[in-house]
């Protein structure tokens, strides 16, 4: 009967008209015991990091050796284990191995919020531009692993501070914040452009925490005077496609009345991140990559930048679900009524039909 497909269609429509809800965090992996925490404002620690970017202050970027890469990979692996398994031994081992690279791993109890973090940063006696890496000490295993990155600090209009705000606001749902330690244009041949280097400590950290099913959000900024026709925010996955995280972020930004553009392979090509090294790695390993270019108009407008930061934070807290659609209660009621009518009619017809 032709009416049956119609009924099925109505049922399907009614199902998808329901609001989208996502399960709350059921279990929270607390930081391990046996760690000595330094209680101070995390922002104070981060300010030290921000004040040491090479390019902002005099200095020279130093190329790591193969041994440096191997040692850092060990450190990052131990941190990953320490957080995911709440294992104090791994954190203590990571701290010990980090000293071989003149890095320090600081367990910080943020006095402003009570949240706990591990901060991996170069000792103050050295400054090679290798970057700093912050990790939430408490991990929510029911959430999508999220990494926030700022590969172009200083140059990209305060991108490192924007990334930090999202990282801390979404605690503990963001696994890590990765921040380059050098201004992107310092090297004459692109040596310090971490978004386009296949070998760097920054890339090593990216690869250590980018896994199948994770989401990497990279924060960038562009000068509106150089791109006057672009919207306030341009999003891209790097190859002209769209992933769920990108769609969810775009939806939240639109709800905040921020104009957005999505690189589709053609439009917004200059801001599309086609050659972004971290994006290529993420896509190859089944992770979602979201490259976010923010107009300088937004960055220097307190209201707009707050809207941007809150939109991304909410996307993360919602596990990249779309904002709920308003339910139309009439649809499921009508569908149920039609189904009931034809069920009764069919039953009566079968009774009157001769055997």
Predicted regions and their residues:
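C-terminal membrane-anchoring or membrane-association module
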Residues: 340-355
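Short, glycine/alanine-rich hydrophobic alpha-helices that insert into or span membranes
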Residues: 9, 336-339
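Hydrophobic secretory-pathway targeting helix
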Residues: 1-23
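N-terminal catalytic or cofactor-binding beta/alpha core of small enzyme domains
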Residues: 17-290, 294-321
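Short, Lys/Arg-rich N-terminal segment immediately upstream of the first membrane anchor
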Residues: 1, 323-324, 354-355
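Juxtamembrane/start-of-transmembrane alpha-helix segments at the extracytoplasmic/lumenal side
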Residues: 321-335
């Amino acid at each position: 009967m032709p009416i049956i497909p119609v009924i099925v269609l109505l049922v399907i429509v009614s199902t998808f008209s329901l609001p989208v809800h996502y399960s709350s965090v059921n279990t929270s992996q607390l930081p391990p015991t046996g760690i000595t925490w330094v209680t101070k404002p995390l922002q104070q620690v981060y300010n030290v990091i921000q004040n040491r970017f090479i390019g902002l202050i005099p200095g020279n970027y130093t190329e790591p050796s193969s041994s440096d890469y191997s040692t850092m990979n060990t450190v990052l692996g131990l941190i990953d284990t320490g957080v995911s398994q709440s294992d104090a031994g791994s954190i203590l081992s990571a701290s010990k191995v980090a000293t071989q690279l003149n890095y320090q791993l600081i367990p910080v109890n943020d006095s402003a919020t009570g949240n706990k973090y591990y901060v991996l940063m170069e000792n103050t006696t050295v400054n090679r531009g290798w970057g700093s890496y912050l990790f939430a000490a408490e991990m929510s295993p029911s959430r999508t692993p999220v990494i926030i990155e700022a590969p172009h600090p200083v140059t990209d209009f305060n991108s490192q501070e924007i990334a930090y705000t999202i990282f801390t606001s979404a605690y503990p749902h963001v696994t890590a914040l990765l921040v380059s330690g050098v201004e992107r244009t310092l090297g004459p041949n692109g040596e310090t452009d971490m978004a386009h280097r296949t070998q760097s400590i920054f890339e090593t950290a990216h690869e250590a925490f980018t896994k199948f099913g994770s989401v990497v959000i990279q924060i960038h900024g562009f000068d509106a005077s150089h791109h006057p026709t672009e919207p306030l925010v341009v999003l891209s996955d790097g190859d002209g496609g769209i992933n769920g995280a990108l769609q969810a972020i775009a939806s939240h930004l639109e709800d905040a009345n921020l104009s957005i553009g999505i690189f589709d392979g053609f439009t917004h090509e200059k801001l599309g991140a086609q050659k972004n090294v971290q994006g290529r790695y993420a896509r190859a390993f089944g992770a979602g990559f979201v490259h976010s270019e923010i107009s300088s108009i937004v960055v220097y407008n307190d209201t707009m930048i707050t809207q941007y930061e809150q939109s991304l934070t909410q996307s993360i807290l919602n596990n990249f679900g779309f904002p709920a659609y308003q339910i139309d209660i009439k649809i499921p009621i009508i569908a149920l009524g039609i189904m009931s009518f034809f069920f009764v009619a069919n039953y009566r017809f079968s009774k009157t039909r001769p055997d």
